[in-house]
Regions:
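N-terminal core-binding DNA-recognition domain of tyrosine site-specific recombinases/integrases
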Residues: 35-36, 74-146, 191-194, 298-303, ...
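Short, basic (Lys/Arg/His-rich) helix/loop patches that form interaction surfaces
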Residues: 187-196, 257, 273-282, 286-289, ...
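Short, polar N-cap/turn motifs at the start of nucleic acid-interacting alpha helices
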Residues: 221-227, 341-361
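DNA/chromatin major-groove-contacting recognition/catalytic segments
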Residues: 239-245, 339, 360-380
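Conserved tyrosine-mediated DNA breakage-rejoining catalytic core shared by Y-recombinases
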Residues: 14, 215-275
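Short amphipathic helical patch at the helix-1/turn junction of helix-turn-helix
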Residues: 132, 203-204, 337-338
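N-terminal DNA-binding module of tyrosine recombinases/phage integrases
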Residues: 7-12, 17-107, 111, 275-284
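Basic, Lys/Arg- and aromatic-enriched nucleic-acid-binding interface segment
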Residues: 124, 128, 143, 147, ...
């Protein structure tokens, strides 16, 4: 650092710094009233701050989007559960390979993001997820003062126009009473799927997610009060044998429900069955959960869904809807809606924080409600 006296009697403190990208030396300066040790110390501090800011600005202006994405993803992963990281990893890889390759972050504008979204050849859900990831990555950049505005949040996805096919799909998300009864009966008919029948019936009565159901432990329910604690979900990222119970994704999912007498019977029956296996089956591994295979490992979602499909194929009148664990959860929502239970109460029961998810099913009236309207008009 050196000092130059100005024409007006003040003192200009100067310093040079090296541009990390060009290798050239560039000047910074600050003018002080006096030339003494106190002014010297103050000037040095100011110049160091200026140099730090200028280098940061240079680095920000040169930062490539792929570098930003990697930096943000490393940070964001720390907030996520292992299952969420595994679920999102594919989206992150796709964005890295298709968006902003070799492009500086500061050069990406809303139009650039819009063109990317418009040209994505994938499902609506995948587009929404990719846009959500871009929103978060650019939010991170705004927070670090790399950019002033988030271009992804200004880009838009077109509103989805509902078609007759969409309405038909929505109505196929749940089972009617004349559909669920024969399906459960078929699951209970075979010893190999009996436990799966208990799981299917339990979800249809409680409305919990399959991950929540298979993470239920004996200590999570109380017989006298019939209170069930749903305080977690089963994370099988490392495989079901190495899985563990983890906290739910949202606060709304952390809940307690009052069980029906049938729900209580199912849990008690499972406790009895597991205790029997523990004492007679040398392959049984006690992992502490209720909804397990006969060997003690929590029931796998894929195996459960496959068993549903095969059981349905054996029915005299197979169900034409896509059968997964979620259809039983949705069935409870439709039943409660059919009985005029308020939307808020249904949301609390099934652990939904967003009314949209429940409302999609809530608004699709079941056959019973449709027929009751017809009966009223018939007698009008």
């Amino acid at each position: 650092m050196w000092i130059e006296e100005t024409d007006n009697g003040k003192f200009k403190f100067r310093e040079n710094y090296k541009d990390p990208y060009t290798g050239t030396w560039k000047p910074v300066s600050v003018t002080m009233e006096k030339d003494n040790s106190r002014a010297y110390k103050a000037a040095r501090k100011i110049l160091e701050q200026k140099i730090t800011e200028k280098i940061a600005q240079l680095k920000a202006s040169e930062l490539l989007f792929t570098e930003l994405l990697d930096e943000w993803w490393t940070f964001y992963k720390k907030e996520l559960k292992r299952s969420s990281v595994a679920s999102l990893r594919g989206n992150i890889e796709e964005i890295r390979e298709t968006f902003g390759i070799g492009v500086k972050v500061v050069n990406i504008d809303p139009k650039y993001v819009q063109n990317y979204l418009d040209n994505l050849d994938c499902s609506r859900n995948k587009k929404e997820r990719n846009k959500s990831m871009l929103n978060l990555a650019f939010d991170y950049a705004v927070g670090l003062d790399i950019i002033q505005d988030n271009p992804a949040r200004r880009a838009k996805l077109p509103r989805v126009k509902k078609t007759l096919e969409d309405w038909k799909k929505a109505e196929e998300k749940y089972l009617e009473e004349d559909e669920i009864k024969p399906l459960l009966k078929e699951l209970y008919r075979r010893p190999s799927t009996y436990r799966l029948g208990l799981l299917a019936e339990f979800i249809s009565l409680n409305g919990c997610r399959i991950g929540e159901a298979v993470s239920i432990e004996p200590c999570n329910y109380e017989s006298k009060s019939r209170i069930l604690q749903l305080h977690g979900t089963f994370d099988h990222t490392e495989g079901y044998r190495n899985g563990e119970k983890t906290a739910p994704k949202t606060l709304a999912s952390y809940r307690e429900t009052i069980m029906t007498s049938r729900e209580l019977e199912i849990l008690q029956e499972l406790e009895f069955m597991n205790e029997l296996e523990k004492n007679t089956n040398h392959r049984y591994r006690d992992m502490g959960y209720l909804f397990t295979t006969k060997n003690g490992v929590p029931i796998q979602t894929n195996s459960f869904n496959l068993a549903l499909k095969k059981a349905n194929e054996r029915l005299e009148d197979p169900i034409t809807k896509k059968l997964t664990s979620h259809i039983f959860r949705h069935t409870l929502i439709s039943r409660l809606a059919e009985n005029n239970v308020p939307l808020k109460s249904i949301m609390e029961r099934v652990g939904h924080a967003d009314a949209k998810t429940t409302a999609q099913i809530y608004t699709h009236v079941t056959k019973k409600m449709k027929s009751s309207v017809a009966d009223i008009m018939e007698n009008y």
